[in-house]
Amino acid sequence: MPQLNPAPWFMILSSTWLIYTIILQPKILSHLPTNNPTNKNNKINTNSWTWPWTQHSSTNS
């Protein structure tokens, strides 16, 4: 079962992560986001409601 031999797969994995962290990550992080996030503190007003089967009615007692 050759897939249990970690020698070739570990080398591929480690070289891929090495390339990603050293070469690609600074290039990706150098781009500026087009839409900067704003610090809006808008509270979302949600109206709560009850489920029909949780309402207590006097006809079912």
Curated annotation (Swiss-Prot):
It is found in: Mitochondrion membrane. GO terms for biological process: proton motive force-driven ATP synthesis. The chain crosses the membrane at residues 10-32. It comes from the Eukaryota. InterPro entries: ATP8_metazoa, ATPase_protein_8. GO terms for cellular component: mitochondrial membrane; proton-transporting ATP synthase complex. Keywords: ATP synthesis, CF(0), Hydrogen ion transport, Ion transport, Membrane, Mitochondrion, Transmembrane, Transmembrane helix, Transport. One of its GO terms (molecular function) is proton transmembrane transporter activity. Its main location: mitochondrion. It is a single-pass membrane protein. The keyword rRNA-binding does not apply. Subunit 8, of the mitochondrial membrane ATP synthase complex (F(1)F(0) ATP synthase or Complex V) that produces ATP from ADP in the presence of a proton gradient across the membrane which is generated by electron transport complexes of the respiratory chain. ATP synthase complex consist of a soluble F(1) head domain - the catalytic core - and a membrane F(1) domain - the membrane proton channel. These two domains are linked by a central stalk rotating inside the F(1) region and a stationary peripheral stalk. Belongs to the ATPase protein 8 family. Component of the ATP synthase complex composed at least of ATP5F1A/subunit alpha, ATP5F1B/subunit beta, ATP5MC1/subunit c (homooctomer), MT-ATP6/subunit a, MT-ATP8/subunit 8, ATP5ME/subunit e, ATP5MF/subunit f, ATP5MG/subunit g, ATP5MK/subunit k, ATP5MJ/subunit j, ATP5F1C/subunit gamma, ATP5F1D/subunit delta, ATP5F1E/subunit epsilon, ATP5PF/subunit F6, ATP5PB/subunit b, ATP5PD/subunit d, ATP5PO/subunit OSCP. This is ATP synthase F(0) complex subunit 8. The gene is MT-ATP8.
